[in-house]
């Protein structure tokens, strides 16, 4: 075969024909149909892998070869009229690189003169690759079949023209003929040769209207892209318009799409022309939208620049006219600001600062951004209530009445507030600690701040700190930033209009640490009485006196509050309400409030005590009253709807009507009488109040290992480990055979795995559960416990006792085991809340086991 001619044979033929640079006859026709293609039989052809291009049937492309091996392949195929299989590489670092593609796009019908082909020259020579020279016959062919570096579907092409350049490189003009797929590689040296099968393009029926419309749409949008993209020669639109072959139009447009190579390969691999046309049209639409967006952005940018220039020239003209007329409107504004400053009762330092900034404003062009910032700064200084205070009302009896009217229960909290106001009345300053109301949601922490403001006859302001993670929100931004503004503290003082409001810092436990600083640290200056007399705001750039402000903070959790910040506050616990308290709150506050908000009168709907209790027990699960208020609101809206529609309705709400309006009741939180060894009832605290929790344990054959499940935290895992180690160390005291630890594993589980559980208060509960499992003895019914344990077997006190007791009452618990150190917490609780409960105060685990396990 001529493909195996040597290089010398090529050179002899070159000399015989007397050529070194081909300028011979015209090209062969660019689109030439091959009727001799047989799709049912295989054929053997040589392969050429290229990168960054996918060749489609009928499309013409140029390729420049720099390797002698590639040049020989091109010459051999050209003189024997043999076809070449063009395959695309997936990765640029593949070892099968044979030729380098020239990116220049060729015209469909004609080629430029060859004196411009120098663009393809000057390609750096590649390092010689000896991998393929050392391949012995076909022993490495399987590597080609297994590689993922090339696509196995490509296009068979013929060489239309071969051009030898003066520098020795060779450029060929290829035209795609038909798609093919590799069946098997049969030769590696000197060129890749494979057995292939042709892939036929399945054309739709001639009367397929959808296909015809699709072709017209492709042509139309392709022309639009050419017209809107200044980088594409306008003559290309005429070429697109004159294409008659539908398949050639699809392939030509697909080849020229500005998309990734893998997407072009997907288009090539479609067997159905209609599907290829659909996907090509989709990519065309994406490209068209990108071009439109790009052009639109460029237009807007040019328009904005023109507008700015126009406004600048107009402003200069206006300024010149004003100078001629002697009328400067902004100078009048400056004078108005100066007159206002004379009326302010501020310090000499503040007056000097104002005068300096006012002088800057006078020298600044009103069209400059700095003018707006300076104006905002001066407005802030004038709007702040410098040394302006509201007159306090220290009538403590009046304050007590307001607190009792607005809040039912929480007597200890109200007593502490009265003490706070008493000190304020006698001493005249606020050097006492900042009050922080701590408790579950819905117990009235925020509303207490409003009541204090009302009692003292002071202004009330509130800022929510939840999610705040930027220090500038507290201290403000520096004036050098565009859009700078003061911090939320000074903004609230400005809004209050006095320098001594009651300032509620809501959700102080939910401040976060962000990349812009730590707002908790900035809050230290706000709350520290030694520092807030000269509170420095970055925007104000001078100190402002906050010492007369009554700051009140609220929090649901103390664990997330900065320790230094926590040290500056006095924590006042606001525990949850009992059922009786919730009923009274509903009658005195929630129901009248909802009737007023929904435009009803007290006679329009009647809710009895039993009905309110039903709502509390079956439709709420909280320490506060927020969810209770929502359910009462639903019932009030039921009445409002019927009144508005002139329908008859039941004014006195009964139990069945509650279920009709609120839906099926929730399962009440009641104690489950589970007489099974290893199951113990504990008491837990959550941010919404107290709950009962079951601890389960069981023995499994094993080697004495401990495991715990139920979405528990590290502290709870440590408590389980301490309990297990204590039992192993004191097994004879509890009557447990030592061999049991060698034969069995113990598994502890805390039900409701979707809820995270942590803390030390389940220590005695887990220890009791493990001993119950080893002894196979049941726990006394209606008994619950809470407490921390140590390795010495001591029972330590825990927190949240009131919430836990309320949860025990709701669950119908009769007896509770607590640490002796928690007895003081029981003494602080009203006797009415303890009715029906029996308490056992213990100091050691032996006492817990004696009280809990049935003998």
Swiss-Prot record:
According to its UniProt record, the EC number is 3.4.21.53
GO molecular function ontology, one term from the record: serine-type endopeptidase activity
Q: What SMART domains would the database entry show? A: AAA, LON
Q: What is its main location?
A: cytoplasm
All copies of the Lon N-terminal domain together span: 45-288
The active-site annotation reads 761, 804
Q: Which InterPro entries match?
A: AAA+_ATPase (IPR003593), ATPase_AAA_core (IPR003959), Lon_bac (IPR027543), Lon_bac/euk-typ (IPR004815), Lon_lid (IPR054594), Lon_proteolytic (IPR008269), Lon_Prtase (IPR027065), Lon_prtase_N (IPR003111)
Q: Which HAMAP family match?
A: lon_bact
Q: Record's family?
A: Belongs to the peptidase S16 family.
Protein name per the record: Lon protease
